[in-house]
């Protein structure tokens, strides 16, 4: 039973890590996107 529970837990940990990585990537992309938009607004307002 120990081996079975381990085989179930390991993939879950991998999935969780992938989810966290994906969320972080999206967050960084959104931050960069908003920064670019702010720069564009600054350029157009000048």
From Swiss-Prot:
InterPro entries listed in its UniProt record: Corticotropin-releasing_fac_CS (IPR018446), CRF (IPR000187)
A UniProt-annotated Pfam family: CRF
Cellular component GO terms held in the UniProt record: extracellular region
Any one Gene Ontology molecular-function term assigned to this protein's record: hormone activity
Protein name in UniProt: Diuretic hormone
Function (record text): Regulation of fluid secretion. Stimulates primary urine secretion by Malpighian tubules and causes a dose-dependent stimulation of cAMP levels in the tubules.
Isoleucine amide modification, residue list: 46
Keyword Secreted attributed: yes
Family in the record: Belongs to the sauvagine/corticotropin-releasing factor/urotensin I family.
Subcellular location: Secreted
UniProt keyword terms in alphabetical order: Amidation, Hormone, Secreted
